[in-house]
Regions:
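Non-catalytic interaction-recognition regions
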Residues: 1-98, 109-479
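Short, charged, solvent-exposed linker or helix-capping segments at domain edges/interfaces
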Residues: 99-104
Length: 479
């Protein structure tokens, strides 16, 4: 328990003692909130608890403050003052501040982290881009936000699992195989019509080139079906590996990579059976429909088409059912803003399956616009396609990119200034932070050069300068 928590408990104990001694009437004490005063002269902590509890006890705030202060048992306080109508200002003893700093140094990067709680179990799913091409800057924003959210929640003690949903089933993967196949045949001198919904990126050509470099025309005389089956697996494996490499370079890592393929057909059939059994799915015109209007959607949704092929919604229902079956108490999805209309139908499906739809929270990610020299950057100079995450990392660095991505609220469009992200000036917040860190490191370097060694038990009481004490208190204000 840190000093702040100890002080809050001491205030609660003082109020309880005042009530027991009938100095205050019976009543439920409001939540005790401590704040750091705007001026150092007003103490290390301040509380308006006396004013907050005046309407509970029906006693003047200053009188309540006096009863609290007179019964306060806190040996770590130098003094306590009552100000104005009933503010209480608390002043810590110097040795308490030094002890807290020693604990901070001992804790290192773990300082401020709260103890891990086993429950609730929370899952955060983010990025989940189709493995059909490189990640672009929009994916980068989702990756930075999701990663930061998971890190913060873990530091706050939450039991969090991060997950990437691999869309490795369905038409987009078929189109990936068709695209690689077309480029493979073209490179081997065959005339072929490029698929209508194929992927035109340079990365597809490079994949085909690598296949030829490794295996030559080995697949040329195979049937289209056999060749497409092989290319689907080769391309998927390569794209997924590249995707993981880009995310690792961005310092983004996942606990679970969940394959959509594992849901077909058993899990999809199972949720359809559940929904049919509980009356929340019906058959019409040969298709299976979810009664999503019963749960707030604007119309019922097709889950299985009349030709027996599942819609995207079918796999998503099975996937989210699987999440709850894994005993997660809270699901957080980070989706692109273009999925806005999809939120209601997935929540409706969860409610139809008997889950609490509020246990699924969807955060929508707005667009990112890149600017260079004041001009909107629409295409990559290198590829003529959308700017990829790896290109952004190469240009401004992973740290700067992550910093800029999470500087703005997720629900507002982000204008990413490439020049600012690279500038070495105080206008660039990343440079400002990195420069401060570099200056701190230089102090340790100069100490080493001067033969001054650090010790595990420094004499912190030598830190008496006003600026030093102010800096220590600033450090101790976290979290």
């Amino acid at each position: 328990m840190d000093t702040k928590d100890l002080l809050i408990q001491a205030i609660k104990d003082a109020v309880a003692k005042a009530i027991a001694e009938q100095a205050l009437p019976e009543g439920q004490l409001p939540t005790v909130i401590l704040e750091v005063p705007p001026k150092k002269e007003l103490g290390d902590f301040a509380s308006n608890i006396a004013m907050q509890s005046a309407r509970v006890f029906h006693v003047a705030p200053r009188k309540i403050a006096e009863e609290i202060v007179s019964r306060l048992d806190a040996t770590f306080l130098e003094k306590t003052e009552i100000a104005g109508p009933g503010f209480i200002n608390f002043y810590l003893k110097s040795d308490v501040i030094y002890d807290a700093l020693a604990n901070l140094l001992k804790a290192g990067s773990e300082y401020g982290n709260l103890p891990k709680q086993e429950t609730p179990r929370i899952q955060v799913e983010y990025v989940s881009a189709n493995p059909t091409g490189p990640l672009h800057v929009g994916h980068g924003r989702g990756a930075a936000f999701g990663s930061a959210l998971v890190n913060l929640m873990r530091a706050a003690g939450y039991n969090v699992s991060s997950e990437y949903y691999i869309n490795d089933a369905g038409k987009q993967i078929d189109n990936l195989a068709l695209s690689v196949n077309a480029r493979y045949l073209e490179l081997l001198g065959k005339e072929v019509e490029f698929p209508e919904n194929g992927y035109h990126g340079q990365d597809i050509i490079e994949t085909a080139k690598r296949i030829i470099a490794k295996d030559g025309d080995k697949y040329l005389n195979m049937s289209d079906e056999e060749r497409l089956s092989i290319f689907k697996e080769l391309a998927l494996k390569e794209k997924l590996a590249a995707l993981k490499e880009d995310l690792a370079a961005f310092n983004v890592h996942f606990d679970v990579w969940f394959s959509e393929r594992t849901l077909h057909p058993d899990a999809v059939n199972a949720v359809c059976d559940k929904l049919l059994a509980n009356g929340n799915m019906y058959k019409q015109d040969g298709a299976l429909w979810l009664k999503s209007t019963a749960y707030g959607d604007d119309k019922d949704r097709v889950v299985i088409r009349d030709n027996g092929v599942p819609t995207y919604l079918a796999a998503d229902i099975a996937y989210h059912d699987n999440k709850f079956e894994r005993k997660f108490d809270k699901l957080i999805n980070i989706w692109g803003a273009d999925h806005h209309g999809y939120v209601c139908r997935v929540k409706a499906a969860m409610a139809a399956l008997g889950y609490n739809a509020d246990d699924l929270e969807v955060l929508l990610l707005q667009m990112v616009s890149l600017y260079r020299d004041g001009e909107l950057v629409k295409m990559s100079k290198r590829t003529g396609q959308s700017v990829t995450l790896s290109e952004l990392i190469e240009e401004v660095g992973a740290d700067a990119a992550r910093f800029f991505f999470i500087m703005r609220s997720l629900d507002s469009q982000l204008d990413f200034d490439l020049n600012l992200a690279k500038s070495q000036s105080n206008e660039n917040p990343v440079y400002y932070v990195q420069y401060a860190y570099a200056r701190i490191c230089s102090i340790f370097r100069q100490m080493k050069e001067a033969g001054i060694e650090t010790t595990e038990n420094p004499q912190l009481s030598l830190l008496t300068d006003e600026a030093e004490i102010a800096l220590i208190k600033k450090l101790l204000s976290y979290p």
